[in-house]
Amino acid sequence: MTSPMKGLLKGLRYIARIFEDEKEPEMQIGIPTDVKHVAHIGWEGPSATTPSWMHDFKPTDQTKTETKGTSNKKPGSSGEKHRKGRRKTSTGNNSPTESPSRVGGSVRPSKRNTGKQREQNTGSGSESGSGLELPQQTDQFVVPKQSKQKKSKGSATGGGEPPPSNEPSNKKETDISVRAVYPCAGLGSSTGR
């Protein structure tokens, strides 16, 4: 049995050498810097050398004018609305569609920085005192500060006397100033954190 296996292997090696010896002519596609025909289709207008598969498609300039024409005829069926996705456009600085994270025309930072910035705003809110407003606030988000007294634990049982005024309430003032900047902060719990 070893001799037929050797003969089979010799035949396979012979066939493999034939394919190894045959070299196909290498096809040169083009100079690597010559990619205008691929990368810049439609940038300089239609050319005479467009590929045959591109004849079915319209240039981008014609599609823009057609979408403008159809938007004049049928408002609401514009193709541009579909391209923009789910973004909503705001009508003004104090419009209700504008996000509450936008303060004074500045854009909200990324999700990574919001925690750090909130801590900084909390710190600056405690430094600002009780009667000063932060310069970033707009009229829409200004919450008037009122003096709130802490409820004593005895009030739940019916004791009901306010705590003495000499007790420090720095945490409450900080929470109030943070709520003035971020009106949604602390709505879920009374402690704020």
UniProtKB/Swiss-Prot annotation:
Tissue expression: Expressed in flowers and pollen.
Keywords linked to the UniProt accession: Cell membrane, Growth regulation, Membrane
Biased composition annotated in UniProt, kind: Low complexity: 123-134
Compartment annotation: Cell membrane
Keyword Cell membrane recorded: yes
Gene: RIC5
Additional observations: Over-expression of RIC5 in tobacco germinating pollen reduces pollen tube expansion elongation.
CRIB domain span: 29-42
Native species: Arabidopsis thaliana
Subunit organization: Interacts with ARAC11/ROP1.
Residue stretches of biased makeup (Basic and acidic residues): 55-67
Single GO BP term: pollen tube growth
The protein's name in its UniProt record: CRIB domain-containing protein RIC5
